[in-house]
Amino acid sequence: MRRSLALALTAGSLAASAASAQACPDARAITRGVRAPLSHVRYLADDALQGRLAGSPSERCAGDYIAAQFRALGLRPAGDAGTYFQSLPLASAVDPHAIGGTGRNVVAILRGSNPALAGEAVIVGAHYDHLGHGGSFSMAPGDSSIHNGADDNASGVAAMLDVARRLARGPRPARSIVFIAFTGEEEGLLGSSFYAGHPAVPLDRTRAMLNLDMVGRLGAGPLIVYGTDTADEWRAMVDSAAAAEGVQVRGGGDGFGASDQTSFYARGLPVLHFFTNVHADYHRPSDDWEKIDAGGLERVAAVVARVARGVASRPAALTFHRAAAPAQAASGSGYGAYLGSIPDFTPVPDGVKLTGVRAGSPAEKAGIRAGDVIVRMGEMEVHDLQGLTNALRAHKPGDTVPIVLLRDGQRLTVTATLGTRGG
């Protein structure tokens, strides 16, 4: 980004923040009687926050709240011009339906304790935007009620803040920890992709990324951890951390998926995505804070804190591994049917451009290849990664669907028989 643009965006961000400060809902009043980390969900998923649509005034209030929590924990600001905010344009060729304007990642650093390793970092992140009043990504078409996004993803932000609390109270890890609340995830991983291109700590000195997305419904079920095949050491580290907290885990697979870890795996970092599975309230107005498993949320945060501390304190870097096998999922229903396409985040005017397909996948069998742009699947137009995810979720394994592609400027249709992840 050019310096002039960066300064302009920063100035606009600070001005908007100052202008909206008095209008933001009173966090103390909203969270009275609710203990952290659930109190963070209680605030972020309150009706007064209007669903935290990326770039909206209510999302700015959410960002201000998160920055205040970082400040209270003693974390250093790592955004623009000495602030906690990293401004970015939300208008995107990847998603022509994005709200536009300027969004903000909220970025803070817990400095590492070892002078020789403090210049290296581990990222712990969670997106804080949601759907506002619904729109095209809602699973309740035509319902313009507030979509509060308690599990998706106020829960991830709350868990991230609890991880920060646990690590800040000491002993501090050897490496630094970068905590990031991402904007624009629902619009196509905009915030995480921008940060990956403009990192507070260079990515060649960033050792791993831990993503928390939808971690508020643990209940009796296992904690799902995607991405354990992205480093040789992950499985043992995750199993050890979970066992110490009495949490059952299930997972595996590579680092590609419909959440922010993808932006970092695509750039060669080991990643994990912590997840407590999909549910009937996903992308609906009914995803409210009262349904969050408070005890489970704390246990997830405890597991992630152990993993983060382990990665940040180990003498050697992780052994990165780009998994060849399809991503594993604990439940075939979690992300719908499986195609096996690998997205390329290079902006295109419309659709989802692919960097490749997985060997033996339905995509490969259908003749889809690197460089293709998916613009339609079945009856659904595909404008962006979220649209592709929604199209897959609308189908079940075994469905045979026409897929419209753009290849070398030509429009063509192939037919794919969708499979199951890991099958």
What are these regions, as identified by a protein language model?
Residues A21-P77, G119:
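N-terminal hydrophobic or amphipathic helices/low-complexity stretches enriched
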Residues V303, A312-G423:
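C-terminal recognition in membrane/secretory proteostasis and scaffolding
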Residues R172, F182-H279, D293, L297:
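Metal-dependent peptidase/peptidase-like ectodomains
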Residues L44, F70, L88-A93, G100-S138:
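Acidic/His- and Gly-rich active-site-bordering loop/insert found
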Residues A108, V124-H130, G135-L189, V304:
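Alpha-helical metal-binding/catalytic segments enriched in His/Glu/Asp
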Residues A280-A324:
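His/Asp/Glu-rich mid-to-C-terminal helical/loop segments that flank catalytic regions of hydrolases
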Residues C24-T31, D47-P57, D95-P96, P141-N153, ...:
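Second-shell loop/turn segments in exported
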